[in-house]
Amino acid sequence: MTRAHLPGILAMAAIVLASNILVQFLFGQWLTWGAFTYPLAFLVTDLMNRIYGPGPARQVVFAGFIVGVFCSLIGTQIMLQGDGFTYPAVTLRIAIGSGLAFLTAQLIDVAIFDRLRQGTWWRAPLASTLVGSTLDTALFFTIAFSSGLTWIEPANDVSWANEVLPFLNVGPVAPLWMSLAVADWMVKLSLALVALIPFRMIVSKARPEQKSA
């Protein structure tokens, strides 16, 4: 790691920290405010990959993972008040799901980007982010809320997330967590397209000696 990599590490740390805070605040029926900041992690990873290469990009990913673990450890100690009961802000399943989803999705993003880096400028960031975002969403929501994985944390009642309701209020019935997952996924896909604009602008301004082939 060099001093030139520090902005990427700090940006990733800030995004992970902000997302862990904002996920506590709802936005509408299906989302939290964290859904709008978390996808920026893919932008940071892709910028580091394009400018410095896959090695520094992975270092940024590991830095973000460490910050995420730290946030989860703090969250498990913060108790919130429910209707006559208390519960941790971050359950074990959420902690495992978020950490595993982040690390797996980001490393896959780095690998796909590096494989496609010689093609059209937008193909590598778009394809890697779409695959990474899909994997991230599937892993997190399944691990955190699926009734089939209650053995991970038997004391954690996820019955609320498995309530059968019309999918996104308009489709056939499905567990609530699936609607939450798809809503989150659609935000990620939308931001993946929007992020191409700052990606192009930042890469074009990078010093020639910084750019990786």
Which functions belong to the PLM regions below?
Residues I15-A18, Q24, A41, T45, ...:
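Alpha-helical transmembrane segments of polytopic integral membrane proteins
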Residues L73-G97:
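Helix-adjacent hinge/juxtasegments
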Residues Q29-L40, A89-A101:
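Structural signature of hydrophobic alpha-helical transmembrane segments
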Residues Q24-G28, M79-P88, L149-A155:
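Membrane-interface helix termini and inter-helical loops of multi-pass transporters
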Residues D46, V67-Q77:
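A generic, lipid-embedded transmembrane alpha helix
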Residues M1-F62:
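Hydrophobic transmembrane alpha-helices
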Residues L92-K211:
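Membrane-embedded alpha-helical hairpins and interfacial helices in multi-pass inner-membrane proteins
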